Regions:
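Post-signal-peptide, soluble extracytosolic/periplasmic N-terminal scaffold domains
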Residues: 2, 6-12, 19-271, 580-653, ...
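Short, ordered, surface-exposed loop/turn motifs in non-cytosolic proteins
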Residues: 49-72, 678-688, 758-772
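A short, amphipathic beta-strand motif
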Residues: 57, 277-279, 672-676, 748-756
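Short Pro-Gly-centered beta-turn/loop motif in secreted/extracellular proteins
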Residues: 76-85, 311-316, 696-722, 733-734, ...
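Transmembrane beta-strands of outer-membrane beta-barrel pores
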Residues: 141, 170-174, 196, 205-209, ...
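Feature captures outer-membrane beta-barrel proteins of Gram-negative bacteria and organelles
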Residues: 155-157, 184-195, 218-231, 370-384, ...
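Membrane-embedded beta-strand positions of outer-membrane beta-barrel proteins
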Residues: 164-168, 201, 237-239, 351-355, ...
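Short, acidic Ser/Thr/Gly-rich low-complexity loop/linker segments typical of extracellular
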Residues: 688-696, 773-785
Length: 829
C-alpha cells in the first residue's frame, strides 16, 4: 500500500492559490513507464479548481465545523483562484472585534464578499486528502484562549427531531403465604426540537396489582415546558409548567417563564455543586429520588452500600429518597441539596428572573393558584474575592420575600457564604406573619492531606418565617398547622490516604421542624486496598448508617465486606450486615466483570432475626446494548417469598434522516445521529451505538456546550465495511440532536494490478468508479495497483476506469473476491 499512500500525498494542496505553474518530475515515481502518468490536475502548486466544496473547518489544531459549504472562486485578471473566506466563516473563528473590523475584501473578486485573512501571521490551508480547510491564526487575534472552551459561534442547534427517553421497571413479589403482587413503573421525557427551541414533557406512570383482582394505576405530567439557549446573554429561556430552581429561595412548581444565566455556557472552572446520595440496601432494591412527587432518578441496586451518581446542578431544595426492598418494605428519608458557595469573577453578574403563577395541589394538579409573582436574583463579583448576591419575590397577593448575602473566598481557609432572608405573609383570616431565615455555606479542600470538607447549607428559620412553598401549603390548609421547617444542614467530609491505600467519607444531614420530629441521616464509610501473601488487590470496607425519620422511629445499620480477586475481572466477597432491629445478614457473593457490557453476580446468605432465621439466594445481571440497557434480579428466601425485578432504560430519536433506538440519554444533554446510508452494523463510540438496518445510529454527544469527539470503532467494523472518516467533532447546545452523514461502503474489497488490453497499466492517478452507483471505488497507483472497496455483485462488471476526463475501459473482476488473496490481475477492456 506504499504506492497508494504516495498517491494520496500527491493530492495535498494548499490554499495560497496564486502561484506559478509547476511541472512535476515524473521520474521521482517508481514506475516502469514514466510517460504513463496523468498528473495534469497537480501541475500548479497549491492549485484548487474553482467550484463549491463541502469541507471540515479547523482552527489551528481544533475542529470547528464539519461539512461546511466553501466556495473557491477565480480572481479576475489572474490565472489563480482563492478560497472565499466569508463573514460567516470569520464569525466561527472567535476573532477579536478589532481584527474582524480590519479585514479587507480580496482584490479581484467582484461581489466583495470574500475577505483577505492571509497575512505574515496567519494562513489558510486546504487539504484535499482530508477534505479540510484549516485556519492558522495567532492567539493574539483570538477572543477566547481557553483550550477547554469553545465560543458560541461554533455551537450548533442540531436538526429538527423528536425523541422519547424511557425507564421501565417491573417487579413481582410472590410470598409463600398470600397473594402475588406486581408493580410497574415507567417514567421519562418526551420532546421535540425545532431550530433552537426544545419542547419537553416529563411523564410518570405507575401501576400496582395486588393479586386479588384489584389494581391501582397513576399517570401524570409533572412538567411540560419550552426552552432555548440565548448564547448572546449566556442564558436560558424557559416557558411553561416547570419547577423553580433557585440558589436562594425554596423550589416550587409554577406556570410562567424563567430567564436565567446558564453556568454550562461558562468555562469549566465555574461549575456548581450537585448532591451525592448514599445508603445501604438490605436486598435487591429499587431506589427512587424525587422532589415534590416528581421522579428525578430511579434505579435498582444490589444488597449493600450504594451511592447514586451526581444529580443535575439545577436541582435545589430537599430531595425525597426511598428504598423499596425485594420484600416490599419501604424506607424513606430526605437529603438537602443546598449548594456550596459560588464565587463570581470580579465584575461578572449572574442572574435569574421568573414570573408566573404557582401550581399547587400535587403533580396531578395543573391549575394555577394565586398569587401572581415575580422573582429576581443576582450574583455580582464585587471584588476579586468577594461576591454579593440577593433576591426578591414580589407578588400581587399577600406574600413577599427578600434575601441578601455575601460570598467570600478566604484563600487557604476555604470559601464561605452567608445570607439572610425575610418573609412577609398574610395568612387566611387576616393573620400577618413576618420572619427571618439565616444560612451559612462553607467548603474547603485540603490538597496536602487529600481531604475535602463541605459544611453545606446550614439554615435556621425562626418560627414566623415562611418560604413560598410553606406559604402555599398554609393557604391550601386554610392556615392549618403544616410542617414548618426550623433547621437544616448537611456536612460532607472525605479523606484519602494514598500511602495506606485507604479512604474515608462522612456525610451528615439534618432537617427538623418547629412542629414535628427531625429527619436525620448519618453515613460513615472506610475503605482499604491491601495484599495478603500472593493475593493482590484485596479490598475491605465498613459502613455505618443511621436514619431517623420524621414520622418517628429510626434504623441503624452496619455493613462490612471483604473482596478477593478471582481471576481476571472477577471477585468473591463476604459481607455481614446488622441493624438495630435484631437483623443479621451474612452473604457470600460472586461477581463477574470481565465483559464490560454484561456483568452479573450471584449470592447466598443467611439471615437471622429476633423471630427466627432463614436462608436467601439472589442474583442479578446488567447488560449494556447499543439500543438500551437491561437489568434483571431475583431473590429467593425458602419458605418466605420469591421476587423478580426487571428494568429497561433507553431512548428513541427520530429525524428527517431516520430513526433509531439507543442507550438512555442523560436529561437534556445533546445526542448525535450517525447516518451511514444503508450500511448496518457500524459501531460508534465502542459499544455505545451501532447503526441499524437503515444505517442510522444515535449516541450521546457528551455535555452541552462542550466539544464532543465521537468516533467510529474502525477495529470492530465488519470485514466488508469501509468508512471514509472515523471521527466526528461537534459542539451542541442543550437538548440538541446533531446529525452527521458518514461515507460508508459495504461490499467486497480487492487489491489488484489493473491491465489494459495491450498489457499496459492505466496512468497513475486514474479513478475507478462504479457505473451502477457513481461511487468512487479507488484510485490507480504505480504499475496499475489499486485498492478497491465497497464492491457489490453488480460492480463486478460495471467498474469504469477514467483518465483524461473520460472513461477509458471497464474492469472485469472474478466472481469471488477476498482481500486475503493478495494482489490479483484485473483486466480492463
Amino acid at each position: 500500500m506504499k504506492i497508494t499512500r504516495l498517491a494520496i500525498l500527491m493530492t495535498l494542496t494548499f490554499s495560497v492559490l496564486k502561484s506559478q505553474a509547476t511541472e512535476f518530475n515524473a521520474s521521482l515515481l517508481d514506475s516502469g513507464n514514466l510517460s504513463n502518468v496523468d498528473l495534469t490536475a497537480f501541475s500548479r502548486e497549491g492549485y484548487v479548481a474553482p467550484g463549491n466544496y463541502i469541507l471540515d473547518i479547523w482552527l489551528n489544531d481544533q475542529p470547528v465545523r464539519e461539512q461546511y459549504p466553501v466556495r473557491v472562486v477565480p480572481v479576475a485578471g489572474l490565472d489563480a483562484a482563492v478560497i472565499c473566506v466569508t463573514t460567516d466563516m470569520v464569525a466561527m473563528l472567535g476573532l477579536k472585534d478589532k481584527i474582524i473590523h480590519g479585514l479587507k475584501p480580496v482584490t479581484g473578486i467582484p461581489d466583495g464578499q470574500c475577505l483577505e485573512l492571509r497575512s505574515a501571521d496567519s494562513q489558510v490551508r486546504y487539504s484535499a486528502e482530508n477534505q479540510r480547510l484549516t485556519f492558522i491564526i495567532p492567539q493574539a487575534w483570538m477572543r477566547y484562549q481557553d483550550p477547554d472552551w469553545v465560543p458560541p459561534s461554533r455551537w450548533s442547534d442540531g436538526v429538527t427531531a423528536g425523541l422519547l427517553d424511557y425507564s421501565l421497571m417491573a417487579s413481582r413479589y410472590m410470598p409463600q403465604q398470600g397473594e402475588t403482587s406486581d408493580s410497574y413503573s415507567l417514567y421519562g421525557t418526551a420532546g421535540f426540537n425545532l431550530g433552537a427551541w426544545r419542547l419537553r414533557s416529563d411523564y410518570q406512570y405507575s401501576r400496582f396489582d395486588s393479586g386479588r383482582g384489584a389494581s391501582q394505576s397513576d399517570f401524570y405530567l409533572p412538567q411540560t415546558y419550552l426552552f432555548r439557549a440565548l448564547p448572546a446573554l449566556r442564558s436560558k429561556l424557559t416557558l411553561g409548567q416547570t419547577y423553580l430552581s433557585s440558589a436562594i429561595f425554596d423550589s416550587f412548581r409554577f406556570a410562567g417563564l424563567t430567564l436565567a444565566s446558564d453556568e454550562r455556557m461558562l468555562p469549566p472552572s465555574l461549575q456548581g455543586y450537585a448532591p451525592k446520595i448514599s445508603g445501604i440496601a438490605n436486598s435487591n432494591a429499587q431506589v427512587t429520588v424525587s422532589q415534590n412527587g416528581r421522579i428525578l432518578y430511579q434505579t435498582r441496586v444490589s444488597p449493600g452500600p450504594f451511592e447514586l451518581p451526581d444529580l443535575s446542578q439545577n436541582i435545589s431544595g430537599n430531595l425525597d429518597v426511598s428504598v423499596r426492598e425485594s420484600d416490599g418494605s419501604v424506607r424513606t428519608w430526605q437529603v438537602n441539596t443546598a449548594s456550596v458557595p459560588f464565587m463570581a469573577r470580579q465584575g461578572q453578574v449572574r442572574y435569574k428572573v421568573a414570573a408566573g403563577r404557582p401550581l399547587y395541589g400535587g403533580t396531578h394538579n395543573n391549575s394555577t393558584v394565586s398569587p401572581d409573582f415575580l422573582l429576581g436574583e443576582a450574583t455580582w463579583g464585587a471584588f476579586n474575592n468577594t461576591s454579593l448576591y440577593g433576591g426578591l419575590i414580589a407578588s400581587t397577593g399577600d406574600y413577599q420575600s427578600a434575601a441578601l448575602g455575601i460570598g467570600q473566598n478566604m484563600g487557604l481557609l476555604g470559601a464561605l457564604s452567608a445570607d439572610v432572608t425575610r418573609s412577609d405573609a398574610r395568612l387566611p383570616h387576616g393573620q400577618k406573619q413576618s420572619g427571618y431565615s439565616y444560612r451559612i455555606n462553607y467548603a474547603k479542600t485540603f490538597d496536602k492531606t487529600g481531604s475535602t470538607l463541605a459544611f453545606v447549607g446550614y439554615r435556621f428559620s425562626d418560627r414566623h418565617f415562611l418560604s413560598m412553598p410553606e406559604y402555599l401549603q398554609r393557604r391550601a390548609t386554610d392556615g392549618g398547622d403544616a410542617w414548618h421547617e426550623k433547621q437544616s444542614y448537611t456536612v460532607t467530609y472525605s479523606q484519602s490516604v494514598p500511602v495506606l491505600n485507604m479512604s474515608a467519607a462522612l456525610s451528615i444531614s439534618r432537617l427538623n421542624y418547629w412542629n414535628a420530629q427531625s429527619n436525620n441521616n448519618y453515613m460513615l464509610s472506610l475503605n482499604k486496598v491491601f495484599s495478603l501473601g500472593d493475593l493482590q488487590g484485596l479490598s475491605a470496607s465498613v459502613s455505618f448508617a443511621r436514619n431517623q425519620y420524621t414520622g418517628g422511629g429510626s434504623q441503624n445499620q452496619v455493613y462490612a465486606t471483604i473482596s478477593i480477586p478471582w481471576g481476571d475481572s472477577r471477585q468473591v466477597s463476604y459481607s455481614v450486615q446488622k441493624d438495630n432491629r435484631g437483623g443479621l445478614q451474612q452473604t457470600v457473593n460472586y461477581s463477574d466483570f470481565h465483559n464490560p457490557d454484561t456483568t452479573w453476580n450471584i449470592s447466598a446468605g443467611h439471615n437471622r432475626y429476633d423471630t427466627g432465621s432463614n436462608s436467601s439466594f439472589s442474583g442479578s445481571v446488567q447488560s449494556r446494548l447499543p439500543w438500551g440497557q437491561a437489568a434483571a434480579d431475583a431473590t429467593l428466601q425458602p419458605g418466605q417469598y420469591r421476587s423478580l425485578g426487571l428494568s429497561w432504560y433507553g431512548s428513541v430519536t427520530a429525524t428527517a434522516h431516520g430513526a433509531a433506538f439507543s442507550q438512555s440519554m442523560a436529561g437534556n444533554e445533546p445526542r448525535m445521529m450517525i447516518d451511514t446510508g444503508d450500511v448496518a452494523g457500524v459501531p460508534v463510540n465502542g459499544n455505545s451505538g451501532v447503526t441499524n438496518r437503515f444505517g442510522v445510529g444515535v449516541v450521546s454527544a457528551g455535555s452541552s456546550y462542550r466539544r464532543s469527539d465521537i468516533s467510529v470503532d474502525v477495529a470492530a467494523l465488519p470485514e466488508d465495511v469501509d468508512v471514509s472518516s472515523s471521527v466526528i467533532s461537534q459542539v451542541l447546545t442543550e437538548g440538541a440532536v446533531g446529525y452527521r452523514k458518514i461515507d460508508a461502503s459495504q461490499g467486497e474489497q480487492v487489491l489488484g494490478h489493473i491491465r489494459l488490453a495491450d498489457g499496459a497499466s492505466p496512468p497513475f492517478g486514474a479513478m475507478v468508479v462504479s457505473g451502477t452507483t457513481g461511487r468512487t471505488a479507488g484510485m490507480v497507483g504505480d504499475d496499475g495497483l489499486a485498492y478497491l472497496t465497497g464492491l457489490s455483485k453488480e460492480d463486478h462488471r460495471t467498474l469504469n476506469v477514467s483518465w483524461d476526463g473520460r472513461v477509458q475501459c471497464r474492469l472485469s473482476l472474478p466472481e469471488i473476491l477476498t482481500i486475503s488473496q493478495g494482489p490479483l490481475l484485473l483486466p480492463c477492456k
